[in-house]
Structure formats: structure tokens, C-alpha cells
């Protein structure tokens, strides 16, 4: 049984005694920074000149420096920029400001696992990864709760990296819910696999195919949308609360029987073999190489695939239906139907 680490197991004073620079002020960046500050930690934000996030960080009371100046000032540098930008950011603004005794913190192990970032000797390298989006991390913290967190140490130059990592995890509220020890390799490979095979890629493709099947059979697109996309949240919420068993306990006998006899017809053993191939590409570094090369070239494949997804008819159907939803919640900075950030 995996040991779970809680607030009582970590010493908050360790991170309170450090100067922390959070590089990036997006979803995770704002949550880490605000939660750490509320936990009594001295925090500055590192952002490039002209960053659209600068005004927001300043409005929320933070001192904003360039990434280079923030890294030079800090004892703990938290790199929360997008994966594809971390390598350049590190080389241009962070690496030369790392001295013995400092700590690098990541919320995802991509750049360490695949060798895009290598820390100099004498620098601790740790991972503190909340298992939820930044807005949830912040909201749960403010409510006196937390989002579970996984923690890893890649380099323990000081001999105290684990203690500081758990202290940081406590500072952002993760140990209120519980923390699990992992490795950079395990976190990176399982996170990418979950996103690609199940949570994002697998689910998106399954929903689109279900929608297409009903439309091609002559059913109304609005009805198809409700059946294969809208109701998905209701089922996933039940699974989140109590696993697949609670989901099956909550549905009708007809739905449960259909689950057993038709699920394996749709998600056949061949799908599992395809999943293994996806995992192999992740483990070998092939996916990372393809992603970074495309990003370095201006992201032509990425942008083409994004555009194709936005043009799928399920999106236009959904936009019209969501206007009718009294319970619909929209983020202030989101344009309905657009993936661009």
C-alpha cells in the first residue's frame, strides 16, 4: 500500500524560510504563487517584458521581475511555463543564475525526463504536481481543502530535497488532501499516457465517433450531442466519486447491462494494443521529439490539428445548445468553441 503524506508529516517552515520565484503566471503559476503567499512564503513572479500576465500578477499584489532577475533573487525557482517553452526559458534566464544550494521545482517532469533541461551540480531538482488544474488548486485551498499532489526528487544534492519538496507541497495545500511519492519518469510517462490514451485523446475521439455514428444514422445532432457529450460529465462525476462501481450502481439495469455487453465491442482488445503502442512512443521519447520539433518549427502540425478539431460539427452543435443551459459556467478569458490560448 502506498504511503500517503499529509500536512502533519511536513515542516512548512522550510519553504517559509526560502525566497521563491514562480516563473509563469498561468493556470498553475497563479495558484502556486497565491497559495504559497497565503502560507507565509515570500514569492515574486518571473515574467518576460510585455507578458500579458504581468498586469494580473501585479494587480494581485506580487512583485514582478524578469525571469532572469527573479531566478537570481530566489533560493527556489519554480518553472511553470508551458513544456515547449521551458527549455529556452531555462537556457536564457535561469541556468546562469543557479548556484549551489538552490532548488528547481517543476509541476510536470517533461523537460527533465526527456533531457531538455539539465541542472548544474549542487542544485536540487524536485517535482510537485497537483492532480488538478490550477483554478481548482486555488479554489480548494481557499475553501480550506486541497488537491492531491505527487512529489518526486530527481537530484538531491543537498540531502534535504525531499523535506523541502514536502514543505512546498504543504505550502500550496496539496498535503491537506494527501501526497504520494513518485519519480520524474513515472509522473511524466503516466501523465502523458493518461492525457493521450484516455482523458483527452481517447475521450475526444470516442465522443466524436459516437456523435458521427448517430448523425450518419439520421438522428438529430442536438440529441446526439446530449447523448454522447453532455451526459458524459454526469457519468464521469459518478466515477470520480466512487469508481466504476459507483457509476454502475447509479445507472439503470438496462444501462448497466449495455455497459457489460457493448463496452468491449467498442473498446476491443485491439484498443489496448494501440494503447501499448502509444505508451511505447512516450517511453522511447518519440512523442516528445515529435512535439518539440513541431513547436520549434512554428507548430504547423499542432495548429492544423487544432483547426481540424474546431471545425468538427459537434462544436457548432454544442455552441448553439450551450446558449440554452441555465447552469452553464464560462471562464472570463475563454471564447466558446475556440482552443487557442
UniProtKB/Swiss-Prot annotation:
Query: A Gene Ontology biological process annotation?
Result: L-valine biosynthetic process
The protein's matches in PANTHER family, at most eight in alphabetical order, are given as:
KETOL-ACID REDUCTOISOMERASE, MITOCHONDRIAL
Q: Where is the KARI N-terminal Rossmann domain?
A: 2-182
Recorded GO MF terms: ketol-acid reductoisomerase activity; magnesium ion binding; NADP binding
Cleaved signal peptide residues: none
Q: Which organism is it from?
A: Clavibacter sepedonicus
Its annotated function is as follows: Involved in the biosynthesis of branched-chain amino acids (BCAA). Catalyzes an alkyl-migration followed by a ketol-acid reduction of (S)-2-acetolactate (S2AL) to yield (R)-2,3-dihydroxy-isovalerate. In the isomerase reaction, S2AL is rearranged via a Mg-dependent methyl migration to produce 3-hydroxy-3-methyl-2-ketobutyrate (HMKB). In the reductase reaction, this 2-ketoacid undergoes a metal-dependent reduction by NADPH to yield (R)-2,3-dihydroxy-isovalerate.
List of residues binding substrate: 252
Q: What is this protein called?
A: Ketol-acid reductoisomerase (NADP(+))
Q: So where does Mg(2+) 2 get bound?
A: 191, 227, 231
Q: Which Pfam families match?
A: KARI_C (PF01450), KARI_N (PF07991)
Amino acid at each position: 500500500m502506498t504511503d500517503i503524506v499529509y500536512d502533519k508529516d511536513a515542516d512548512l517552515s522550510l519553504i517559509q524560510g526560502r525566497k521563491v520565484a514562480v516563473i509563469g503566471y498561468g493556470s498553475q503559476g497563479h495558484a502556486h504563487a497565491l497559495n504559497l503567499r497565503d502560507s507565509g512564503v515570500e514569492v515574486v513572479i518571473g515574467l518576460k517584458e510585455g507578458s500579458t500576465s504581468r498586469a494580473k500578477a501585479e494587480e494581485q499584489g506580487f512583485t514582478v521581475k524578469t525571469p532572469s532577475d527573479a531566478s537570481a533573487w530566489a533560493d527556489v525557482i519554480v518553472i511553470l511555463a508551458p513544456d515547449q517553452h521551458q527549455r529556452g526559458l531555462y537556457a536564457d534566464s535561469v541556468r546562469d543564475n543557479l548556484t549551489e544550494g538552490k532548488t528547481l521545482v517543476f509541476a510536470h517532469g517533461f523537460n527533465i525526463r526527456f533531457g531538455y533541461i539539465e541542472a548544474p551540480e549542487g542544485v536540487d531538482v524536485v517535482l510537485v504536481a497537483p492532480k488538478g488544474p490550477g483554478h481548482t488548486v486555488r479554489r480548494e485551498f481557499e475553501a480550506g481543502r486541497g488537491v492531491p499532489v505527487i512529489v518526486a526528487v530527481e537530484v538531491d544534492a543537498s540531502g534535504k530535497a525531499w523535506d523541502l519538496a514536502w514543505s512546498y507541497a504543504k505550502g500550496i495545500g496539496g498535503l491537506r488532501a494527501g501526497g504520494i511519492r513518485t519519480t520524474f519518469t513515472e509522473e511524466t510517462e503516466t501523465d502523458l499516457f493518461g492525457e493521450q490514451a484516455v482523458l483527452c485523446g481517447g475521450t475526444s475521439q470516442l465522443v466524436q465517433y459516437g456523435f458521427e455514428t448517430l448523425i450518419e444514422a439520421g438522428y438529430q445532432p442536438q440529441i446526439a450531442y446530449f447523448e454522447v457529450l453532455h451526459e458524459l460529465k454526469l457519468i464521469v462525476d459518478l466515477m470520480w466519486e466512487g469508481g466504476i462501481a459507483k457509476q454502475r450502481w447509479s445507472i439503470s439495469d438496462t444501462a448497466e447491462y449495455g455497459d457489460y455487453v457493448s463496452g468491449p465491442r467498442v473498446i476491443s482488445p485491439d484498443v489496448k494494443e494501440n494503447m501499448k503502442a502509444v505508451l511505447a512512443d512516450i517511453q522511447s521519447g518519440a512523442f516528445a521529439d515529435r512535439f518539440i520539433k513541431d513547436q520549434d518549427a512554428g507548430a504547423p502540425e499542432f495548429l492544423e490539428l487544432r483547426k481540424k478539431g474546431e471545425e468538427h460539427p459537434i462544436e457548432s452543435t454544442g455552441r448553439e445548445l450551450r446558449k440554452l443551459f441555465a447552469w452553464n459556467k464560462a471562464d472570463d478569458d475563454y471564447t466558446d468553441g475556440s482552443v487557442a490560448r
